[in-house]
Amino acid sequence: MAVKISLVDLAQNIGAELHGDKNILITHVSSIKNAQVGHITFLKNSRFREQLKSCAASAVILSQDNLSFCRVSALVVKNPYLAYVKVAQLLDSSPKLNANIKSQSVIHSNSILGKDVGIGYNVIIESGVIISDNVKIESGCIIGKNVKIGIGTYLWSNVTVYHGVEIGEYCIIQSGSIIGSDGFGYIKNDGVWIKIPQLGKVSIGNNVEIGSCTTIDRGTLDDTCIGDGVIIDNQCQIAHNVAIGSHTAIAGGVIIAGSVVIGKSCMIGGASVINGHIRICDKVTITGMSMVMKSITTSGIYSSGIPVQPNFAWRRTAALVMRIHSIDKRIKDIEQKVNCFFYIVIVGFFIVLGLTGLFPLIYFFVKQG
């Protein structure tokens, strides 16, 4: 059932200045193009203000400089995009698990469950688990031995949390993710791979969100650590012993090899690959499809991906790259020949001056000058 909130209540909740009918009931947040009666939309960029003329929304979130272009009720704020996010949170009617425990779940008798915990169908909770207040665990999740889950954390369906993992407060883990599986640790002996026991765990801070089908491996000896406020997209691989600093964002498909240390407030673009045993300092942005092979010690933006181009142009570029060493050798040969030529010209010039008797005359005038 849709949530209904009056415009005046929305204004009070987000600290907006209201213009128009305060009693309008808002049920949905929509784009300017698709908004209908009862919907609220937002104008983030003044370039799109002309779209307000045909907008059917009941209200618009916008900044003061765009108010005169709005023909319906408005909520005026300094940051329309941030205000839209707050309104969307208030109007979010996504189905959530209630504070009850389904009888089909299997919960070990010595596990500890806090107040208002919700457990969905076919959840398995093994021994020694500590689940704090207001935690919700959707259907099909498996929680291994001695796991700790902090207040208000939400696990969507079919999440697997291996033994000993610690998850902080108010985290969200989307469906299909696996936390605490063995890291890829082996030693080769006489041509045979021998498995190295992964004795560490995974430690996740507070307010962390992990997307669907992401895997975070447990440490070999020390823990794999995810800092507070980290956001990780879908289908990422975080290998053993990795440490990710607080408020770092990692887009979909990123692969982080073992023992990487990533600083605070970094942004890792989609499908990037980070080599093992390196360090990335705070406030580094790595653009999509990049391959990071060595440590980064200075904050900034780094890239190595190849942008798309027409196939014929790409084939020419690839062919040129294959010839780069021979081209470099030719350039060096040409430089050597040019330098040799100028040397011969200069020596010849002075020889001619000496033979013609002009050199003493030139020297005399230079000295007089």
Swiss-Prot record:
Which InterPro entries does this one have?
Answer: Hexapep, Hexapep_transf_CS, LpxD, Trimer_LpxA-like_sf, UDP_GlcNAc_AcTrfase_non-rep
Q: Which UniProt keywords apply?
A: Acyltransferase, Lipid A biosynthesis, Lipid biosynthesis, Lipid metabolism, Repeat, Transferase
Task: List, alphabetically, the PROSITE patterns matched.
Answer: HEXAPEP_TRANSFERASES
Record's keyword annotation contains Lipid metabolism: yes
This entry's Gene Ontology molecular function terms read: N-acyltransferase activity; UDP-3-O-(R-3-hydroxymyristoyl)-glucosamine N-acyltransferase activity
Per the record, GO CC terms? Answer: membrane
Assigned EC number: 2.3.1.191
- Enzymatic class: transferase
- GO-annotated biological processes: lipid A biosynthetic process
UniProt record similarity statement: Belongs to the transferase hexapeptide repeat family. LpxD subfamily.
Classification via HAMAP family: LpxD (MF_00523)
Instruction: Give the protein name, as stated in the record.
Output: UDP-3-O-(3-hydroxymyristoyl)glucosamine N-acyltransferase
Please give the organism. Answer: Blochmanniella floridana
